């Protein structure tokens, strides 16, 4: 079963810090926009009247609650089995909201309503190539956004693609195989001396 803890380091790496986006007219801290923070902070981190200063002072623990919230929305409360597929669903929601999820749903062959539910999860879990299909769909989405609206999005394309490339399914599989091999080697060395 996939876990939001599997995406924390990746998201932490790519969501560097505090930025004021002039074109949006709002602050973003570690990937969380002010409008999102204002809406969710009362529920997620018990801030009844959040301020921009609260967003600027966001702690690691508070930030992780937002990541977990979006993970659960992207994976139907952690129901996606494959970590690679779940990571891409999270990235689609984290960066593009329900529009990103709709594109993932279209790619996987289910109704594109922007809400991950049992039918979307079943389609993902039943398809051995789901992670690769979702990866290609998100890559296509990023490239399309940058080509259709270059003034707003072309400046972000390289970063989006770099971020996505770290989630390429074959890279995740190689890391998993490498970890298993390392454990096997440690066990062998420990028991054969």
Where do the PLM segments sit?
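Cell-wall polysaccharide-cleaving catalytic domain and substrate-binding groove, primarily
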Residues: 1-172, 182-192
